[in-house]
UniProtKB/Swiss-Prot annotation:
Record-linked SMART domains: Aldolase_II
Cofactor requirements of the protein: Zn(2+)
Region (Disordered): 1-22
Organism for this UniProt entry: Penicillium rubens (strain ATCC 28089 / DSM 1075 / NRRL 1951 / Wisconsin 54-1255)
PANTHER family named in the record: METHYLTHIORIBULOSE-1-PHOSPHATE DEHYDRATASE (PTHR10640:SF7)
Protein known as: Methylthioribulose-1-phosphate dehydratase
Length: 243
């Protein structure tokens, strides 16, 4: 190791990702990524997860097999931090030989809205519903479904409680881009148009889901994936999504 590399290694704030607490973000993110991999949400290194804890943001790296991720692979940003340009983001801990997640500006967008955790998956069911909505309702329509019990697992909006059985769940859909970072403006626009939404679908790509904390983001992501799978099966049977 050359002197410059020794300096980086010595001053890399590794203590930020070292904890015996299973609820520590550096331990939670690899554990969540393993679960998501087993559920088929983050195959082929796709997807990502980020958690905000106080003035620190913990982010899964780019290009690491999600089922093999370890705490020492996690990036840490000082919060708040500039979203753009990428070179101005205040990383206070960088794993050697790994690249920051391409999802970073999208995660930061969720944190700007007060989220405590943001999850990005490549769920097949999420992709399929974006295609069905485009074919049936056009490219500008959002995903809508009502009268499904699992809708109760999705917030009505910040401080507004949860949706009810008779409510209509609406999830905006944005178009995919060639590069992940370029989705940011679309995500921001969708958040502005649907301020009560806790998720945004990306056509032919996947979904971003955020929550007030890690548990809420995870359970909301689970509920949505269940709903999307149900919606695909309902469509096969000719059943309407909204009564």
């Amino acid at each position: 190791m050359c002197p410059a590399d020794q300096t980086v290694a010595t001053n890399n704030n590794d203590h930020l990702v070292q904890s015996e607490d299973p609820e520590h973000p550096a331990n939670l993110i690899p554990e969540l990524c393993r679960k998501f991999y087993n559920w088929g949400w983050v195959t082929g290194t796709g997807g990502g997860t980020s958690i905000r804890q106080g003035d620190h943001i913990f982010i899964a790296p780019s290009g690491v097999q999600k089922e093999l991720m370890q705490p020492h692979n996690i990036f840490v940003l000082q919060w708040p931090t500039p979203k753009y340009p990428a070179s101005e983001r205040n990383y206070i801990r960088k794993p050697l030989k790994l690249n920051p997640s391409a999802c970073t500006p999208l995660f930061l967008t969720a944190f700007e809205q007060g989220a405590g955790c943001c999850i990005h998956t490549h769920s097949q069911w999420a992709v399929l519903v974006t295609l069905l909505v485009e074919r049936e309702k056009g490219p500008d329509a959002c995903f809508e479904i009502s009268n499904i019990e699992q809708i109760k697992g999705i917030p009505r909006g910040k401080g507004k409680g949860m949706l009810g059985f008779f409510d209509t769940l609406k999830i905006p859909i944005i178009e995919n881009t060639a590069f992940e970072e370029d989705l940011t403006s679309g995500l921001e626009a969708a958040m502005n148009k649907y301020p009560d939404a806790y998720a945004v679908l990306v056509r032919r790509h996947g979904i971003y889901v955020w929550g007030d904390n890690t548990a809420k983001a995870k359970t909301q992501c689970e509920s949505l994936d269940y709903i999307f799978q149900l919606a695909v099966e309902m469509h096969k049977l000719g059943l309407p999504w909204v009564k």
